[in-house]
A protein has these predicted regions:
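… and, occasionally, acidic/histidine-rich disordered N-termini of signaling adaptors
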Residues: 155-354, 358, 413-426
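A glycine-centered beta-loop-beta connector
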Residues: 46-50, 55-72, 114, 124-144, ...
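Short, low-complexity N-terminal regulatory "tails/caps" that precede and couple sensory modules
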Residues: 1-27, 132-149
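Sensory/regulatory domains in signal-transduction proteins
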Residues: 101-147, 151-154, 192-194
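Active-site-proximal, acidic helix/loop segment immediately C-terminal to a metal-coordinating Asp/Glu
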Residues: 225-244, 353, 357-413
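The conserved cystathionine-beta-synthase
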Residues: 32-51, 58-59, 76, 100-123, ...
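Bateman (tandem CBS) regulatory domains
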Residues: 17-31, 85-99
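A short, polar/charged loop-to-alpha-helix boundary motif
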Residues: 71-87, 142-157
Length: 426
């Protein structure tokens, strides 16, 4: 549950600018359905409105639930479910406890409510009602992010005071990825170590029937600003992988690039799907040039093939003792930045996987750390040598060896960045 004392502190610290924005600023007029309508009606409505993420279920003008496109489509996709559910009431796939907020609720309070209610609300959206509880429309987590990014400078002191709470939120976002990772991999490690209590490095894993999708993400900055960016990326990535985009990491990067540039106003095109991006963009103050370096990987476990697309983040791998550590080199453009074109196309690279092959990803916090006698960067060569010398050992032991070498190399030098490092054996 959300700590009420944090909410009270936030209310006390609201600036005049923050007080101008309320939940109705995010209102999107979206057609609802009634409990009397069938799942066939919902399917038709979703097809007519491809941008709808969710549909409210309303009875006597009061919202009673929320149907999410992802869950609805996945439910009907199961064998015989169209025959079983098409003509039944749409409440069969309804979330009976969605977040419903008053149109006059402040953005500050709304942000805490959305984060406190978990990842589901950030991804699927929330219902906005009037003072009588009557349905007005929907708000999306994506639009909320746009407002919060604009208000971030004004709220920095408050966010810093809530840093411990932010750390809990960030770790909760990572939990499902750890669970899926342990389900699909037998010998692996994942080392996540923010420079501060929260950070801009993020990892993602999601299992599917035919394989799993893996991502290592290094967002702009560290600390609170970096952590805020990871929440944006986590929400976007969940949405992107709903369709068959998981089989096309380069395509997923392209979609992510467009979403980030639009959400943060790092675009020249003012077409923003009905949302007044210029009103909320930090670009108008010349402050926003944020994005991420990342590697997206789709592992087809049935075919034994890895498809990789990288934005300034390489993939390291080694097959046997007779070979050196090899790299799949990334494209040299990051995701979402002002100098990355809206239509930039990343490249997919395929790697056949053999039993026992070891694969590794790391953010630049490890590679770029200054240390040693010469006070130079740790570097890819030193990292590759460590991998080659130890790849036959269990992955958790490799993690300990690499990280101890990193700590020893850093010595008394200042820590430069967050570190996120993962490895797995196929």
């Amino acid at each position: 549950m959300l700590d009420q004392s944090l909410l009270n502190q936030s209310r006390a610290g609201l600036s005049e600018i923050e007080a101008e924005y309320i939940a109705s600023s995010l209102l999107r007029i979206c057609p609802p359905v009634s409990p009397q309508q069938t799942n066939l009606d919902v399917t038709k409505l979703l097809n007519e409105h491809p941008d709808l993420i969710s549909i409210a279920v309303v009875e006597d003008n009061k919202p009673i639930g929320l149907i999410t496109r992802n869950i609805f489509m996945e439910g009907l996709a199961k064998p015989f479910h169209h025959d079983l559910f098409d003509r039944k009431s749409c409440i069969a796939f309804m979330d009976k406890d969605p977040l419903v907020v008053d149109q006059n609720m402040s953005i500050q309070e709304l942000s805490f409510k959305v984060l406190g209610s978990g990842r589901k609300t950030l991804n699927d959206g929330f219902i906005i009602a009037d003072e009588n509880g009557d349905y007005l429309g929907l708000g999306s987590g994506e639009d909320l992010v746009k407002v919060v990014s604009f208000l971030q400078a004004e709220k920095n002191r408050l966010v810093t005071e809530s840093i411990n709470y932010a750390s809990v939120i960030q770790k909760s976002f990572l939990r499902s990825s750890r669970e899926d990772m342990s389900a699909v991999l037998q010998d692996y490690f994942m080392h996540w170590e923010p420079r501060d209590k929260v950070g801009g490095d993020y990892y993602f894993c999601k299992k599917f029937d035919d394989g799993f999708f893996l991502a290592l993400i290094d967002c702009t900055g560290h600390g609170v600003p970096g952590a805020f960016m990871t929440l944006i990326m986590a929400s976007f990535l969940d949405h992107i992988l709903v369709e068959d985009n998981r089989h096309d990491p380069a395509g997923a990067l392209a979609i992510m690039n467009k979403k980030v540039k639009m959400a943060l106003g790092q675009i020249n095109d003012s077409a923003t799907d009905g949302f007044d991006i210029e009103r909320f963009s930090t670009k108008q103050n010349g402050q926003s040039d944020d994005g991420m370096d990342t590697a997206f990987c789709w592992v087809n476990t049935q075919a034994g093939i890895l498809t990789y697309a990288g934005a300034k983040t390489p993939l390291f791998y080694i097959g046997d003792a007779s070979s050196d550590v090899q790299l799949l080199e990334p494209d040299r453009k990051g995701v979402g930045y002002i100098d990355t074109p809206m239509d930039y196309a990343w490249t997919n690279q395929q790697l056949p996987l053999t039993k026992g092959m070891c694969l590794y990803l790391t953010t630049d916090g490890l590679i770029d750390q200054i240390g040693g006698v010469k006070k130079i960067a740790f570097g890819k060569k030193r990292f590759s040598t460590l991998l080659h010398e130890n790849y036959l050992k269990p992955m958790p032991e490799q993690e300990s060896i690499v990280m101890q070498a990193y700590y020893d190399y850093q010595g008394k030098q200042k820590r430069r960045d967050d570190v996120c490092l993962m490895g797995f054996r196929f």
